[in-house]
């Protein structure tokens, strides 16, 4: 069963752009040889890391989005793990997230349709504005009780 995955990995900052491009190309060919389809490759460039990793404070971020069998993902992760230029990597299966978001949208649409069907035909009576409430409120009498407070008794 094919699933949609995202793979984000961080390459050492001292690796040249040519090395990064060659590494990305080998990963892409490895994925396609395993029967996967690579949907998107984004190179985010050098960014500062949140914390130090192997004495490095920054790294080159690369994002893959692909559709593959789980065995293809295992092979990709193995290659990233043994590679010398990769600092960190993260694999996320996003097809479940997309299904969950689609389900939420359908539920939201159902609730909106139900609310529209149950809505009254005539508009609801308008609430008086704050300015109208202030002008209609009784004026305070000096030395008398404050309007709106219960009377002492």
Swiss-Prot record:
Region entry Disordered, spans: 101-153
Ranges of compositional bias, category Basic residues: 101-114
GO molecular function: small ribosomal subunit rRNA binding; structural constituent of ribosome
Composition bias, Low complexity: 127-143
CC terms in the record's Gene Ontology section: cytoplasm; ribonucleoprotein complex; ribosome
Lineage top rank: taxon: Bacteria
InterPro entries: Ribosomal_bS6, Ribosomal_bS6_sf, Ribosomal_S6_plastid/chlpt, Transl_elong_EF1B/ribsomal_bS6
Function: Binds together with bS18 to 16S ribosomal RNA.
HAMAP family: Ribosomal_bS6
Protein name: Small ribosomal subunit protein bS6
